[in-house]
């Protein structure tokens, strides 16, 4: 049989393994890479369990996280896969967004069923906006009783439904260890799992498809030409002579026109998501714009002062606070390119928050920031990061 030709133009999807410790997340990741490397050797390489388990440390928003990145291809897609071996690493990754997921494989051991961390991971996936979860029911080679497997599957579906995930999501029976050992029956189940990923995880919306948004990093004046702002385009596409709105930090927004777009001292007709661009804005003075504002497509974004966030508070060892904080705590919230002071309201029944905790809080900022659900922020005291969070709900 002729081999399928691999195309480099496949859709790219970010995926990850989640689930309780010792249920086989890392073994499942290793099995996927091995089985796909055996089936499509020209496009994949196999990653051993040890290589994934000894995850290198990464720093994201001042927080150290152990996380492994592997990649692989199916016939339909190219996947980047993250595996955070430790429970604390998983939580930190989800909240800081070191690796965002378009979908997740929830690994549940058939021998145990859903455990406390299984629940916690699914809840967190909901809070941080993972769009889709499907299930790998692992260690099925160790369970002979069909009825027991059905029972565990029902429990997992109930758990997904509780958090508003797809109750009808694929649940694929696997044995990651047997697949790694080369057992053909179980290798085929891993292929079935990947086919389920291809078919059930929706294609992610590309950043370029969203309305234009660029945070302002720097502002300077070019004599005789006007005011130039620089920054990295976060979303969308901007064309020369487009009208834009300048939002956030100040009471009023203002509109202007982009009369020149430059990148690396070259003139461009467009700037798109990911570009570091310099925009010349018509009729604006240097003092009309400041760092921390955003330049955006008019009418698409609104600044807010009150929101709820899911936050990870750094432990002392991670360079965080040495002491707990209480209600009405007033740190700085760093959004995109600037710090804004905010007042923290803790949930009812929570007296204080300890370094190393994961907490939901309500925040009132002293200046408005253009935000939507999912926007990430750091919590800082005197320029030092003490926490990381994500906007879960906008209140005002």
UniProtKB/Swiss-Prot annotation:
Statement: the UniProt record of this protein carries the keyword RNA-binding: no
Reaction(s) catalysed by this chain's protein: GTP + H2O = GDP + phosphate + H(+)
EC number: 3.6.5.3
PROSITE patterns, per database record: G_TR_1, G_TR_2
Region of interest called G1, as start-end residue ranges on this chain: 19-26
Region (G2): 62-66
Region (G3) residue spans: 83-86
One Gene Ontology cellular component: cytosol
Domain tr-type G span(s) in chain numbering: 10-205
Subcellular location: Cytoplasm
Domain of life assignment: Bacteria
CDD domains per UniProt: EF_Tu, EFTU_II, EFTU_III
Chain positions recorded as GTP binding sites: 19-26, 83-87, 138-141
HAMAP family associated with the record: EF_Tu_B
Name assigned to this protein: Elongation factor Tu
Provenance organism: Corynebacterium jeikeium (strain K411)
Lineage: Bacteria, Bacillati, Actinomycetota, Actinomycetes, Mycobacteriales
Gene label: tuf
């Amino acid at each position: 049989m002729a081999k399928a030709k691999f195309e480099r133009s496949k859709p790219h999807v970010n995926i990850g393994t989640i689930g309780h410790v010792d249920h086989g997340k890392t073994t499942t990741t290793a099995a996927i890479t091995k089985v796909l490397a055996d089936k499509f050797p020209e496009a994949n390489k196999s990653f051993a369990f040890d290589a994934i388990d000894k995850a290198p440390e990464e720093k994201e928003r001042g927080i150290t996280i152990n996380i492994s990145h592997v990649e692989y291809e199916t016939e339909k897609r190219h996947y980047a896969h993250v595996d955070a071996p430790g429970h604390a690493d998983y939580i930190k990754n989800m909240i800081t967004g070191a690796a965002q997921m378009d979908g997740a494989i929830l690994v549940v051991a058939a021998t145990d069923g859903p455990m406390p961390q299984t629940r916690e991971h699914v809840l967190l996936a909901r809070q941080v906006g993972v769009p889709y979860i499907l299930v790998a029911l692992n260690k099925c080679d160790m369970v002979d009783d069909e009825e027991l497997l059905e029972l565990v599957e029902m429990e997992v579906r109930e758990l997904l439904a509780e958090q508003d995930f797809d109750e009808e999501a694929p649940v694929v029976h696997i044995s990651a260890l047997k697949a790694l050992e080369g057992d053909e029956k179980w290798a085929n189940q891993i292929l079935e799992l990947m086919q389920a990923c291809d078919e059930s995880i929706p294609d992610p919306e590309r950043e370029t498809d969203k309305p234009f948004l660029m945070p302002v990093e720097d502002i300077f004046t070019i004599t005789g030409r006007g005011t130039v702002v620089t920054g990295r385009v976060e979303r969308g596409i901007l064309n020369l002579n487009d009208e834009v709105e300048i939002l956030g930090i100040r009471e009023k927004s203002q509109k202007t026109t982009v009369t020149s777009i430059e990148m690396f001292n070259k003139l461009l007709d467009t700037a798109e998501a990911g570009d570091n661009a310099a925009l010349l804005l018509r009729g604006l003075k240097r003092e009309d714009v400041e760092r921390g504002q955003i330049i955006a497509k008019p009418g698409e974004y609104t600044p807010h002062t009150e929101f709820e966030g899911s936050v990870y508070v750094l432990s002392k060892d991670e360079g965080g606070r040495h002491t707990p904080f209480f209600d009405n705590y007033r740190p700085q919230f760093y959004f995109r390119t600037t710090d804004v002071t905010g007042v923290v309201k803790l949930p009812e029944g929570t007296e204080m928050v300890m370094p190393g905790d994961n907490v939901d809080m309500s925040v009132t900022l002293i200046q408005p920031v253009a935000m939507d659900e999912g926007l990430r922020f750091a919590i800082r005291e005197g320029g030092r990061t003490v926490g990381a969070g994500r906007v879960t709900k906008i209140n005002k």
